[in-house]
Amino acid sequence: MTALEDRVYDVVISGASIAGSAAAILLARRGVRVALLERRSDPAAHKVLCTHYLQPCSYPVLEELGLIPALEAAGAVRNEARWYTRWGWIEPKAAPSGPELPYSYNIRRSTLDPLIRSHAAKTPGVDLLTGHSVTGLLQEAGRTVGARVSGPDGEVELRARLVVGADGKDSPVARFAGIETRTYDNERFSYFAHFRNLPLRDGITHSWFLEPDVAYAMPNDDGVTVVAVIPGKDRLPAFRANLEGAYTEFVRALPGGPDIDAAERITKITGTLNYPLHSRRPGAPGVALIGDAALTGDPLWGVGCGWALQSAQWLAEATATAATGRGDLDQALTAYIRRHRRGLGGHQHLAVDYAKGRPFNPFERLMFSAAARDEAMARHMHLFASRLIGPLRFLNPVALAQASVVNLRHRGPRAAPPAHLPRPTPATTATGPAPHPRTATLPATSQNERLTP
């Protein structure tokens, strides 16, 4: 076999999870020679802290990748959803005689990551190099022309027209390229646990918007459901004092929530106390960023996996020809940057604002209340929540007028905030709730631990 330093590549991709593997497949199918680097050697390596939710915006990418049959064979669950609000449940349904609602899948990363990585490894034109990581970039005349790569046999230099950072929210490639990171505080924290055989009405995803707290229960493959609580940080002292008890109390208090006492909890309670949102310019001369490396959303919305797949597809469409030397790479990267910003910038802007830990604003109250009262508005909400339409289309004048008409038809006393646990007061933040006698005894993570992949 040719020594690694003597191999010729058009593109070097750092990171072989969802974004990196998808980009490698899509680029190679367009004639690009790809080195796909993964720092971990374990073929089963996967991201731990994740919603495991593929938004419907990801379905066209999964279809192009040819992964739909493999996902369904692996037990992926089609992700229908309903959302609880102070006005009742939003339950999107297909229009009479209309097409079914767009969907994608819920599937655990322990299943998805090895599946898509294996698919990439079998794709002609892709060299999957596990146990290898980028330790620096090669630069000439102000542009990146390759990467320094560390592996089991030492460090080598790989020259390439394009280096792609698919290496997560703390992206070393972005740091080596000097790409600025914009960081936005998140005034909520989150904890997750996985349950087997958890009863859920209709077996579909449930989300609770409790203003400002949020929670969700998402069924996945192999009969496993992830239950997440995402409270405002004023509840943090109670979780620090007694994670097990606070998590359990929070879930039990959810209106129409899952009966976790009737299920088997199969994991520890894991999560993060501080998960800021990040945005970066997704390209520089000779460098592109995809997935969380370009934009880290709020886990509250479950958008990371879908955006990873979309950004991989946009990159391949924009740069494949230029990456093989048959076009202007700078122009191609500019086209990718514009597509990325046009597709995700508006969604991220709204997510940054909602991450302030606030209740719904007037526009959100208008649209959520109308969606809870009207099937057509619920379908409109579904398209937006699926990231199939952007904020401008979601809040277009016609939609706002329709929502107003719906709400005028349901005039009555102003809806109170959602009933849940009372907000903490200074007298109650020092101690947490007592554990319920039926609470499982599996250990929980340290309350100060932030898990990383």
Predicted regions and their residues:
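Conserved phosphate-binding and hydrolysis motifs of nucleotide-dependent enzymes
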Residues: 15-20, 168, 291
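Beta1/beta-strand and adjacent pyrophosphate-binding region of the FAD-binding site
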Residues: 4-19
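A conserved beta-strand/loop capping segment in the N-terminal third of enzymes
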Residues: 63-114
